[in-house]
Curated annotation (Swiss-Prot):
The active site is at residues 756, 833, 866. It comes from the Eukaryota. It is an enzyme of class 3 (hydrolase). Residues 121-917 are vacuolar. This is Probable dipeptidyl-aminopeptidase B.
Amino acid sequence: MATEKGHGRDDEERVPLTRGSTEFRNSIDSFDYSSSTASLSLAVIDRINNSTQDAALGEKGPRDDDDDRYWDDDVEYDVEDADYIPSGGKPMHKSVKIALWTLLFLSLGGWSLAFVLFIFRSHDTYETPISSEDNISSGGLRGDRITLDDVLGEEWMPRHHFISWFPGPNGEDGLLLEKDGLGSTGYLRVEDIVSRKDTKSSKGSIVLMQKNTFTVGGETVICSQVWPSPDLKTVLVLSEKKQNWRHSFTGKYWLFDVDTQTGQPLDPAAQDQRIQLASWSPQSDAVVFTRDNNMFLRKLSSKEVTTITSDGGVDLFYGVPDWVYEEEVFSGNSATWWAHDGNYIAFLRTNESAVPEYPVQYFVSRPSGEDPNLGEENYPEVREIKYPKAGAPNPIVDLQFYDVRKGEIFSVDVADRFPDDYRLIIEVLWASNGKILVRETNRESDILIIAAIDVLSRTGKIVRKEDINALDGGWVEPTQSTRFIPADPSNGRPEDGYIDTVIHEGRDQLAYFTPLDNPKPLILTKGPSEIVNSPSGVDLKRGLVYFVVAGNEPWERHVYSVKFDGTALQPVTNVSESSYYDVSFSDGAGYALLNFQGPKVPWQKVISTPANENPFEEIIEQNNHLSRKLRLFSLESKVFQYINIDGFSLPVLERRPPNFDPTKKYPVLFYLYGGPGSQTVDKKFRVDFQSYVASTLGYIVVTVDGRGTGYIGRKSRSIVRGKLGHYEARDQIEVAKKWAAKPYVDESRMAIWGWSYGGFMTLKTIEEDGGRTFQYGMAVAPVTDWRYYDSIYAERYMHTPQHNPQGYDSSAISNTTALANNVRFLVMHGTADDNVHIQNTLTLLDKLDLANVDNYDVHVFPDSNHNINFHNAHKIVYTRLADWLVNAFNGQWLKTNNPTPNDSLFRRAATWAGLSI
């Protein structure tokens, strides 16, 4: 469940400005994958929530100017043109027009009066949204209200520029890649960040590609993504990109020569075959790539392609992850790593022969693009995915090496490693002189080992081992953020080392291990704040590490630096303000793209880091369009606070309608995600679905980061292990009870909703509550039984079903009697969800049928995946949520045993309609 991931928070989950689309690709794409991300992704919701995770994927919004100097990912818009109906026939006589208009107004008036009488005579009245006139003083000048279309579109998205920092061929710092879609100054350029501030100067600018198209043998190639070689002489080009899963894709690859501005196929003998992955050698003299799950090497000195592996196929993957490793471990599409000297390539060999398949059916579309066989046109297309569910056989992974000079593959045995079927390889990091660090865990992700391998001597040993389960009952989150620190005796570093995140005094902190085989680190950070997916940048010359921390409060983010010896801890951002920052650093950490993400209107600036002797600052985005909109619209107010439940201090965000009146009674909607290590209560600026509910519908929205979530200490996080949903549901219910007791809350109108893991939590909460506090629930793409979810995620937090059968039983949504005690609940799911299979929803429906429970609604979206966006589905999801919620708080879903027709109401409506009955 990766990144609203997921569903993520992905999403709606992210990679620094074009990282993944333009950066020097010499290893796995670097993702700022926080320890919080479950692959029950926060990705879908994040698109609605306008959330930018870490320094990676940001949201884009309307532009204020024509400044195209900073690179943005392409934005696709769905444009639906209204049907144009031409007029025809003779002009209508004026008197006839007048008569018709008079009749129309009289009819409309009568219907309007009847409607008003009907509403006021009905007992099902509800809190009317506060009028815009009453809200002028607390919001914009006009007090306008946002619409659902506003929050689903680009209207309120902060514009976010991505900068793809590039390591200079000669050690230059502060170089960046730029792409200009108009091609006025070249399509792809490398520029010095300092000299580029002077737009009249071309100093430091190198044009790599004049245009985004070129011709090869009469075929026009249109760039989808580009990766310059480290020496800037050749560009690796991807065209005809086709998405596979969340992170993976295929396409045609080309080599574009910068000097001649001409291109050639990466594999001249098979230029029409689609490739899964390609990456540059650090020396710019070769490209390794994977096609049909086999690996190949193309040296630029020749047009010949060398076959590295030949037995890859459906069950055997080389250099690329399978579905579960892509989703839950690497959050990316690469399992290939070049050594710094270019002499060796490390790669994963993934054997899926024992992994069961899950069929994903497509009833409307044919994603394969292939025509069905004759006579099979009316059958759904089925895609079989190797998907290991909890307790099922996992893929067996081995780290192998390719000696580029000798052309041979070899493996290195390490004593006392986990058995093949009980091992997860979660990170690979090259050091120097042929040494490589491999991070592994056991299947349940609670014992960590670090193995150091020497590929020159072909020997290896375990240099560090940690039993996380014994330490605090927790688990190991896979990250790709460990940083190698090379030896530099002149700068006080006699040995190689690495910076890693460790558990120290109940928090995630930074630690420096040196030499590589030293298991005892120097702790770099301490205190109550937790490190966020760090380090973010390393300045080797000045001996500094930069990192992001959840500041004085868990809903904040601030940037700090500290020396390699743990001294001179300094803030980079203004820690006196309660703010949320994100950052990406240049290769040498002399410069940074600083992203202010809230609570006020986001802005971005490129700065020199404090240790840089040459001060520099350039504002590149202020989001003036949002500042202007805020002056016109009335939005919700936000109240951040802590609520103590069972001795744990939980972050809570309350969104109040404009012109909040404490003497009124408001309905309340709880919105949650709640996955292990995740965070939903933060100070990012966002105008999302929750904003619409509070600002326009006039309801209070409450979000609680309960036990199990991130950045409030490992004690509260680890407690949920083995019993997902138990403590988290209790926290939601106990906080809801406190809100129900508030004088401004209508305790008879309380609902809860979530997507993905949040969908699971919605159902678990209303199951545990049994209608005593919440009356309504809305669950989108929910897990209903962790046995149905993928093994790596589920077992990380629940152990295996064989180890913890009782925990799986109690976590499953199964108490149909309790669900029946709620007034009503809604479940929505996509049929082609490859992440949270619709099996979850269908088995729940079967339980409800067997128990004769019918107080629920279901909406199934054909061919939609976990994001639910096929054929207008994304808009329908949120429209359905909003309408269903209004009906609920209107009292339209009141339970009635043995309902009978209301004849008097029917006759009254028929009379108003002019019907004779």
